[in-house]
Amino acid sequence: NNFNVWSIIMSVVSANNNALSAITALPASVSGGGLNLIKTQTISSDTATVSFIHGTSDVVFDSTYKEYVFKYINCHPASDDQKLVFQATTNGSDFNTTVTNTYFYAQHTEADNSNPFAYGADDDQAQGTAFQRLNESTGADADQSISGYLCMFEPSSTTFVKHYLSRSSTIFDQASHVYGAGYFNTTSAITGIQFKFGGASIGSGVIKLYGIS
């Protein structure tokens, strides 16, 4: 409520009985937060899939954190015209969890002859079990790749569906920015996420998993 918010503000201001710039520590009532790196997977040669499964290879993906973030950085496909996709598992091996989502994008071509902002009707799912697309197509030229992030909220919940949101930036002779969001329609705990390109291996790239505290 407003009283609690004001109390926190005043506790910060009076923490050192000085200017805000002089504060070196927060009161106990004010919690911090940050990205806690859990796992980095670096791809340097053609790789079909990249998986993050709880309890495997030092991966934590359980009730330790309420929110997890995957960052995919300069993921480059082994062949042209590819979309990075992902799916979730509840048993550590089958990546086919039912998902409903939304997907829209903005684009601007290098030739400056097209700049659509549109809903991706071919890129969403309604109670589907396929791998979900994260980006508009990226090419296999040496300088082309996809970067972005995927947020998963409380994957360990056995009460609620599992919400996610994503944002991706892609180059394929045009700038593409994709916004995605949806939910995995299961009350079982999600124990892992897998990434791959829809029709090619991942030639190179980095995918990182963080827990949010």
Residue ranges, per PLM feature:
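Short, Lys/Arg-enriched N-terminal segments with co-localized hydrophobic residues
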Residues: 1-9
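Surface-exposed molecular-recognition determinants
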Residues: 11-213
